[in-house]
Structure formats: C-alpha cells, structure tokens
C-alpha cells in the first residue's frame, strides 16, 4: 500500500524506535479490514521491533498501538493514510519510548491531570487541521495512563459520524469537547490546566518581540536574529492561517507545497536561530511606557521589549447573518478541504466569488451532489482560468447579485435564504452545507486602542511598516497592506525587521 519512496523514508524513521511496539488489530471480513491488515503487515515487516496481533476492539476495523503487555490508549479506527500517516508514525515512535519534542512544562501539565479522560476524534483523511489534534491527544495518552484517544475516520464509520459536519470533532467521555484545530496547550487549557505565568518571570527584555506566528512573523524573526538582536515570538502556532491552506503553488522557487509542509519548514528555519519561540499562548494587551513596550499574555505574564512587530494575521470572515453563528460546525464551514468529504453526495453552497470561493466550489463539485455559488456583486471576481473551469462543471450553479440573508436550520443546516438584488425577490434554497469564503478578518481585537486601525480593523502602517506608535511595527495580513499573499507577508516581515533594527540603532 506504500510506494517505494514512502517505504524508504518510513524504514529510516523506524530505526529511531527505542523499544518494541505491538499493533493490536480488530479486523473483519470487509474490504477496509483487508486494507488495514495489509498496511499493518507491511509496516510490521519493516522493523524487528514491530509486531502484529489480533483482538476484538470497540470498532472494526481499528488497531491500537501498544507496548508489549501494556495498553497505551492510542487507537486508530480506520486506515491512517493521507494526512494521518504522520500521526501513525509519531505514535509508533512515542510509544516505543522516543522522547517527545514538547517542553518539559507541557509534559508536566499532562502528567498532573487528574481524572479519567477518554477522547474520540472524528477526522477525514483530507483534513489538514486534524493531524495536530490527533497527534496532541495521542501524545497525552502516551504520557498519562488515565488518558485514552481514538482517531475515527468518518468515511469508514459513516453511521457513527452521520451528524458530524466539521472536522476535527473531538468528544471527551462521550460529550462534545471541541471542533477545529487545537494545539496541545489549547486542549490543556480547556481541561483547566494553563501555563504558569512564573515560566515567563525571569525572561530578560527583548530587542524585538514579534506577536504572531505566520509568514510575516517568521520572516521578521529570522531577519532580526541574523542582525544579532535578542528576538522573541509569541504565537498560538507557527505557520498561522497558512496551516489551513491546502496547496501553495505561487511561492516562487517552490513549485508546489502544502500549508502544513510550509509551516513545518518555517518552524524548522526559525529553530536554526537563537529565537525564543513561545507557542501555544496569545497576547491580550500591549502598552508603550517610558521604559519599554510591554506585552501582556493570556496567563497574566508580561514581556518587555525595545520594539514590537505585530504580525497576528487574519481569520475567516463570517457572513454575520441570522443562523450562521449557531450552526457553525453544524453545516456552516470554512474549510472545504477539511470538511468537504463530510458532505459527499449532498447539496452545498459556497459563499464568495473570489479565487478562494471559486476554488472551493471546484473542489467540492468532485465530492458533493451539487454546488451553488453565491456572489454579492454582479460578476465573479476570481481569475478567468478558474471561472472557466467552474463553468465547465455540470453540477454547479452560479448566482450573482445574490445577498445571503439567513442560514436556516435548528440542529443542522437545512437551507439558506437569499435576496436576488436585481429583482428584490427572496428565495429559500434547501441544502445541507454552507462553505463561507468571503475573505479574512484581521486579528486586532486584542489591541483595543493601542495603535491606529482603519475601518476594516486593519493596522494602519507606512512604507516602513511603522504604526502610529514609535517602536511598534506591523506586518502581514493584519495590516492595511492591499494584497494578502504569503510571499508579500514574508517581504513585509523582513521590511519591518530591518526598520525595527534601524529604530533600535537610532534610539
């Protein structure tokens, strides 16, 4: 089931195992069970430290990743290929005794959790957000014997996942726990365990402190570190919104990559320099005093720096119409690559006629029964090549001059109301899912009145990435820079870094 290149890479990784690992599989006579047995046999034959046995488990087909004679609580229900293959490889290494790369403070938080925690995560193999959650919960299961975790492929267990309309969907002890991408710190926080502010008490002031973790942040950090400046990053996750991007084909010199691969490479590049990257935590306030610029974190800790570069990026913009908020993850979705497979053979709408919306409609047309694309303007704004491709599809309708007015449904989406602005007529379209692709909203709510914002909530900057507050710079999608592209954000981050360096020299 694995191609030659992947087998070679896997064989090298399996050499890092520090102890024996046993696959315990629950198999039936169905085709998926046969595929799973073939995969596990193929992997087991690649290392003398791996073995395979069979036992009836809660779900079939499924398998646990155990130590000989010891259950770890790590289970995969389905066949973990696609984006989840890395989750399987990591689970093998961690169960074998390979030390995780998490900070000791995080490991201690996991060990100190009290109670029994039985997690189940519904995923799709095309979901780019899912592996982060699966890998975090698997690691927690390996570290704490009171935690178990099962990854469940919704495409294999359709009856069980029938009402799951967004992935990853995490359940704890049978109750809904969370949806969407979560870091290990996010999960711990939801369980009531937060990073101690004392961890930050002894940090010396920075020359440059960068808030945010996307392309602009990474670029700025590398540039300032190369100038010999003491550099820190405060970020929820390295890569930012790029983590949720499926394919990247316009990053010059790299013909094709994925958002997750790009983010992984960015993190590795940051690690090559003396940069204090503090991830899994967010900033909540910023203040300039006579002594320093002070950034307050969500755990109450305060960091000081001579300069700050704000690069907090942007998140999905919502429709802000009745019914939308209540039905997010219940039919209202933002990631077609993640959640599209959950709507197989169903009718969906895509809201937005730009490149993102048209690309989403094209992708979904290959999965769902029918796509209706809504655009507020009189014509689509996407590139012509994308529009031509969209119009060639037989199961897509395009509605322009269409103002969406209400998401309809109680426990899940059943339809959408819209106004035909050319006639003033109201219409109801019955459907099962709505994918919102109307642009991004800058992550600036935490700034309050600290720096000048425009009417769209973007930070106002000049050509040198200065804000209206000396010493505070901004870069990337959080700013009023017109074009929002990865490569432009990276250039902006470098520009902000060089001007922060110049500011420090002159002040």
From Swiss-Prot:
Its cofactor is FAD. Coiled coil: none annotated. The active site is a redox-active disulfide bond. InterPro entries: AhpF_NTD_C (IPR044141), AhpF_NTD_N (IPR044142), Alkyl_hydroperoxide_Rdtase_suF (IPR012081), FAD/NAD-bd_sf (IPR036188), FAD/NAD-binding_dom (IPR023753), Ferredoxin-NADP_redctase_2 (IPR050097), Pyr_nucl-diS_OxRdtase_2_AS (IPR008255), Thioredoxin-like_fold (IPR012336). GO terms for biological process: response to reactive oxygen species. Serves to protect the cell against DNA damage by alkyl hydroperoxides. It can use either NADH or NADPH as electron donor for direct reduction of redox dyes or of alkyl hydroperoxides when combined with the AhpC protein. The keyword Calcium does not apply. Disulfide bonds join 335-338. FAD binds at residues 207-222, 467-477. Homodimer. Its EC number is 1.8.1.-. It is an enzyme of class 1 (oxidoreductase). Keywords: Disulfide bond, FAD, Flavoprotein, NAD, NADP, Oxidoreductase, Redox-active center. Pfam families: Pyr_redox_2 (PF07992), Thioredoxin_3 (PF13192). It comes from the Bacteria. NAD(+) binds at residues 347-361. Belongs to the class-II pyridine nucleotide-disulfide oxidoreductase family. This is Alkyl hydroperoxide reductase subunit F.
């Amino acid at each position: 089931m694995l191609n030659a290149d992947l087998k070679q890479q896997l064989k090298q990784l399996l050499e890092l195992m520090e102890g024996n690992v046993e696959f315990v599989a629950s198999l039936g006579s169905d085709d998926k069970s046969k595929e799973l047995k073939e995969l596990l046999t193929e992997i087991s034959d690649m290392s003398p430290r791996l073995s395979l046995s069979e036992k009836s488990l809660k779900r079939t087909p499924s398998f646990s990743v155990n130590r000989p004679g010891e259950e770890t609580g790590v289970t995969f229900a389905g066949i973990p290929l696609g984006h989840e293959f890395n989750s399987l490889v990591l689970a093998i290494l961690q169960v074998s005794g390979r030390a995780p790369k998490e900070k000791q403070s995080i490991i201690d938080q996991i060990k100190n959790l009290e109670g029994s925690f039985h997690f189940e995560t519904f995923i799709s193999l095309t979901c780019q957000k899912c592996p982060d959650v699966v890998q975090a919960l698997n690691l927690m299961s390996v570290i704490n014997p009171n935690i178990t975790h099962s990854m469940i492929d919704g495409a294999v267990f359709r009856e069980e996942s029938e009402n799951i309309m967004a992935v990853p969907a995490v359940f704890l002890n049978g109750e809904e726990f969370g949806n969407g991408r979560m870091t290990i710190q996010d999960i711990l926080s939801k369980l009531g365990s937060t990073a101690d502010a004392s961890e930050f008490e002894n940090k010396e002031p920075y020359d440059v402190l960068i808030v945010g973790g996307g392309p602009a942040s990474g670029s700025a950090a590398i540039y300032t570190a190369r100038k010999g400046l003491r550099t820190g990053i405060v970020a929820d996750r390295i890569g930012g919104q790029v983590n949720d991007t499926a394919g990247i084909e316009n990053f010059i010199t790299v013909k094709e990559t994925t958002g997750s691969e790009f983010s992984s490479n960015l993190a590795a590049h940051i690690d090559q320099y003396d940069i204090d990257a503090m991830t899994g935590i967010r900033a909540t306030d910023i203040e300039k005093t006579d002594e320093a610029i002070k950034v307050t974190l969500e755990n109450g800790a305060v960091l000081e720096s001579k300069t700050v570069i704000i690069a907090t990026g942007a998140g999905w913009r919502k429709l802000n119409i009745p019914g939308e908020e209540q039905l997010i993850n219940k039919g209202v979705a933002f990631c077609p690559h993640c959640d599209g497979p959950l709507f197989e053979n169903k009718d969906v709408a895509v809201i937005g006629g730009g490149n993102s919306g048209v690309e989403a409609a094209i992708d979904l047309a290959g999965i769902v029964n029918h796509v209706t694309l809504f655009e507020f303007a009189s014509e689509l704004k996407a590139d012509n090549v994308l529009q031509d491709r969209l119009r060639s599809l037989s199961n897509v309708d395009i509605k322009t001059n269409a103002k969406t007015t209400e998401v309809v449904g109680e426990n899940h989406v059943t339809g959408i109301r819209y106004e035909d602005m050319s006639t003033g007529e109201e219409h109801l379209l019955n459907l099962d899912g709505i994918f919102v692709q109307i642009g991004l909203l800058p992550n600036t709510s935490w700034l309050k009145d600290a720096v000048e914002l425009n009417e769209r909530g973007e930070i106002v900057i000049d050509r040198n990435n200065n804000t209206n507050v000396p010493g505070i710079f901004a870069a990337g999608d959080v700013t009023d820079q017109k074009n929002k592209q990865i490569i432009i954000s990276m250039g902006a981050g470098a520009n902000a870094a060089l001007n922060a360096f110049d500011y420090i020299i002159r002040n």
